[in-house]
């Protein structure tokens, strides 16, 4: 309805999809021949954990969101498989923890085109923060930021540890001014500009639509987003009809950026994603999930994600019935 205010009159047609049925999902994709597909599905939302008592929430939160990767990965991976099976090449935008799910899919030949949020929540906040500190208009500020979902949650959620590496280059009116700032403070304080809770999801939605338009309309937009073509973490990217291209400044190589994001992933619950897509949980993540939920898993292969996701949901439901009514 709101699109009418902007002179836009899209046709909207809801269709029920069972993403556990890859064959039927493939048939639907072949029938509809979409230019782009956006995955907004997840089996268990992180925000349910906030409903637990504060001390228990804080304990589970300290396992990091990567602890719930089976729940975050399963449906998006099924959709990616259906897209591949269709033989078509739509832009695939994955919104579900794309810093960690996209690289798993990338290892098994199912890489989404791009993710959303995470670095793309941090980057506009950094620009806003610098504008506030300098009194300069946001339009005069440009940044190049390599960071991870971990940098987004560390200032916001209980139990996350500091020290995740990142890269930040700041320019004002084309002049490099990075040395004028404490970049760790900039990153932390910028994230704190967001209110607590889930209100930030409106910015996540903006990130999603921005990425969609940039590719469908071939805008060649220089922006930030996570998981381009299956890479871990977030990067400066250019989005166009060609898809996603990482665009780094000369001060940092792609290999260095990837290594930074892999190191950050270890502070987000994931020790390693192996070449065959096997996910290895960090030891602290394993211990906390075992202690709080009775969920015991040190590593898993992508094809095991579904069963583990249902096991995680059952463990959470059993725990939640004690506290959530």
Which stretches of residues belong to each language-model region?
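Glycine-rich phosphate-binding loop and adjoining beta1-alpha1-beta2 segment
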Residues: 1-22
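Conserved Rossmann-fold cofactor-binding substructure of NAD(P)-dependent oxidoreductases
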Residues: 16-34
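Rossmann-like dinucleotide-binding core of oxidoreductases
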Residues: 77-84, 88-171, 202
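Conserved NAD(P)H cofactor-binding loop of Rossmann-fold oxidoreductase domains
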Residues: 40-46
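NAD(P)-cofactor binding segment of oxidoreductase domains
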Residues: 54-88
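Long, compositionally biased stretches enriched for glycine and/or charged residues
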Residues: 137-325
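Redox-cofactor binding/interface segments in oxidoreductases and associated redox assembly factors
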Residues: 37-39, 94
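Glycine/Thr-rich phosphate-binding loops of Rossmann-like dinucleotide-binding domains
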Residues: 46-48, 102-103
